């Protein structure tokens, strides 16, 4: 049987995981503008990202952010001056904090690279 509460895409995490958050995180990390997204993403984009993240069970949010950034269908791209790792660190370590979406995750703190899938 399949555990539908498992922290995996298509189960407790939507598939594809958090597409708006991925779009939001790139310019927040890179500030690239142009074809890569706005230098300062709109508040609407942030609200959509936070709604997507809020819909994921709190215990699965770190995993969802990890799956989002390491997507199989469309992995992150390196940009000049903004590596995939920089984007990943921003998303995993900052999107759940008060300054962004202000959402609880695991007991004892926010997300860290060590508790997200790779």
From Swiss-Prot:
Molecular-function annotations in GO: alpha-amylase inhibitor activity; serine-type endopeptidase inhibitor activity
Database matches in Pfam families: Tryp_alpha_amyl
Superkingdom of origin: Eukaryota
Predominant place of localization: secreted
SUPFAM superfamilies per record: Bifunctional inhibitor/lipid-transfer protein/seed storage 2S albumin (SSF47699)
GO-annotated cellular components: extracellular region
Disulphide bridges: 7-60, 21-49, 30-82, 50-101
SMART domains, sorted: AAI
Keywords in alphabetical order: Alpha-amylase inhibitor, Disulfide bond, Secreted
UniProt keyword Metal-binding present: no
Cellular compartments annotated: Secreted
Function: Alpha-amylase inhibitor.
Similarity annotation: Belongs to the protease inhibitor I6 (cereal trypsin/alpha-amylase inhibitor) family.
Protein name: Alpha-amylase inhibitor 4
């Amino acid at each position: 049987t399949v555990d539908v509460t498992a922290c995996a895409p298509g189960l407790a995490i939507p598939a594809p995981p958090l597409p708006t958050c991925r779009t939001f995180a790139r310019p927040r990390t890179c500030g690239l503008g142009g074809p890569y997204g706005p230098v300062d993403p709109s508040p609407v984009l942030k609200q959509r990202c936070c709604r997507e993240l809020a819909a994921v069970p709190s215990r699965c949010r770190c995993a969802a952010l990890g799956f989002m950034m390491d997507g199989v269908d469309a992995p992150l791209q390196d940009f000049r001056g903004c590596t995939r790792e920089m984007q990943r660190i921003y998303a995993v370590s900052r999107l759940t904090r008060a300054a962004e979406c202000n959402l609880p995750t695991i007991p004892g703190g926010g997300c860290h690279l060590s508790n997200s899938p790779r």
